[in-house]
From Swiss-Prot:
Pfam families membership: DUF167
Lineage, uppermost ranks: Bacteria, Pseudomonadati, Pseudomonadota, Gammaproteobacteria, Enterobacterales
Top-rank taxon, per record: Bacteria
Gene Ontology CC annotations of this record: cytoplasm
UniProt record similarity statement: Belongs to the UPF0235 family.
The protein's name: UPF0235 protein YggU
Length: 96
């Protein structure tokens, strides 16, 4: 499975999360996953909620339209984004 996969109702992303980064950003490809740096620490689900908020802004969707399918407690996650309104250039380059 590739890092970004289209499905009938949106996108499925395989992510590698770097918590406690200096700023939030989509870094790029990291092996067969997309590396995302976030500023939140990996404590009590803070990183997951921060990740959904960040991805919501990037894809212009509500937080409820971002579902962490796998990897709730790890750095390797599979995230589904339902009906994205826009696709960031870093992700769009990987879908082609």
């Amino acid at each position: 499975m590739s890092a970004v996969t289209r499905c009938e109702d949106g996108l499925v992303l395989r992510l590698y999360i770097q918590p406690k980064a200096s700023r939030d950003s989509i870094v790029g490809l990291h092996g067969d996953e997309v590396k995302v740096a976030i500023t939140a620490p990996p404590v009590d689900g803070q990183a997951n909620s921060h990740l959904t908020k960040f991805l919501g802004k990037q894809f212009r969707v509500a937080k409820s339209q971002i579902v962490i399918e796998k990897g709730e407690l790890g750095r390797h996650k599979q995230v589904k984004i339902i009906h994205p309104q826009q696709i960031p250039p870093e992700i769009a380059a990987l879908t082609e």
